[in-house]
A protein has these predicted regions:
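Domain-level signal for soluble alpha/beta catalytic cores
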Residues: 1-195
Length: 195
């Protein structure tokens, strides 16, 4: 697997490769063995990278259409989140940093279909929080507003013009990123709050 930079940071990730034999699915046994022991027993909030970002950043092997696994990926994520819900988590944070980029029509279509299906499958009491970062969401506000979220998080560090997007996001709760994840140790609180 290829390793590349996570957006424009100095962090790296292994690029997922999607091929004809790729069949994403959720395994509660594997999850119970490898992830469950690491989870906080307080069950505050479960966080994960969203499927739109995952698929957008994935690489197609042998010119295979990576978007052909959308339905299987939707089911895998939905099964995982229903499992998390049954563990007692009332808050789910889905991170979609790709929303700060120019999305392809396929990404936009996948976003709409995934979040529509997710809201149909989760208990209405489960609060879904959408987190964006690494860019301006202006081109994707309508898309974001078309889905139902308890809160939407906007990045003010990479692009402070997101501030003007607050009133255009159709969500009752907005959170704002004011601390740079690139250098959290050099934060000057006074200057940050003045901004």
């Amino acid at each position: 697997m290829e390793m590349t930079k996570w957006f424009d940071t100095n962090y790296h990730y292994l690029v997922p490769e999607i091929e004809e034999t790729t069949n994403p699915s959720f395994s509660d046994q594997l999850f119970a063995q490898q992830v469950l022991p690491e989870l906080d027993s307080i069950k505050q909030k479960f966080c994960l990278i969203g499927p739109v970002t995952f698929l957008a950043l994935a690489k197609s092997a042998d010119s295979f259409d990576k978007y052909s696994i959308k339905e299987e990926l939707t089911k895998a994520y939905t099964d995982l989140l229903k499992y998390i819900e049954n563990l007692g988590y009332a808050n789910v944070q889905i991170e979609e940093p790709i929303l700060g980029s120019d999305l392809s029509d396929q990404d936009k279509s996948f976003f709409s279909s995934f979040y529509s299906k997710l809201s149909e499958n989760l208990n209405p009491a489960t609060k879904t929080h959408l987190v964006t970062y690494f860019g301006n969401i202006e081109d994707n506000i309508e898309l974001i507003s078309s889905a139902s979220f308890e809160s939407v998080h906007l990045d003010l560090i990479t692009d402070d013009s997101n501030l003007k997007n607050i009133e255009n996001v159709n969500c009752k709760n907005i959170s704002l990123g004011i601390i740079s994840g690139r250098n959290i140790w050099r934060l000057n609180w006074e200057k940050t709050l003045e901004r």
